[in-house]
């Protein structure tokens, strides 16, 4: 995959990286606020911000995270159902798909698979971060099968790990991935930390 920003900082000398980082955060957040108020572009005089695409300062302001919140909110009063929705949402991670799905379909595996393959624009999932294959009971599951066929059977295991972690997202992620064996555990981390949006005490 070609990364247009791969060499963007080559040769750049930053005198105070910490100050520069927080200045960037402030500038980027100001852009988001102006956009949300409907102020027309450009939202900054900085030519780099005008020409480039950048993440929001706060992840919860990203379109994908907002879609995850909307999708999971109806299930916030049931930890098992919330965990199911969060793990599916992070395996999918595509706002346009999540916005079309009713979370009640997660327990209807056949209907869910049919919907993902035939009722949403393809691809049904996002490649913003890799969701690699995972292991369960001696079998390897790729992304689609993992979040449709397998996920309903994993809920008790996931909830048990999350409760046993005593509120530590890194501990929960490591406990889960010690079984899943994923070479990139970021989707697990994102699903687990999403619980705090709805139930900060878990």
Which stretches of residues belong to each language-model region?
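Structure-specific DNA junction-binding interface
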Residues: 1-139, 197-198
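Catalytic DNA-binding helix-loop module of base-excision-repair DNA glycosylases/AP lyases
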Residues: 166-202
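Helix-hairpin-helix/helix-loop-helix acidic hairpins
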Residues: 119-181
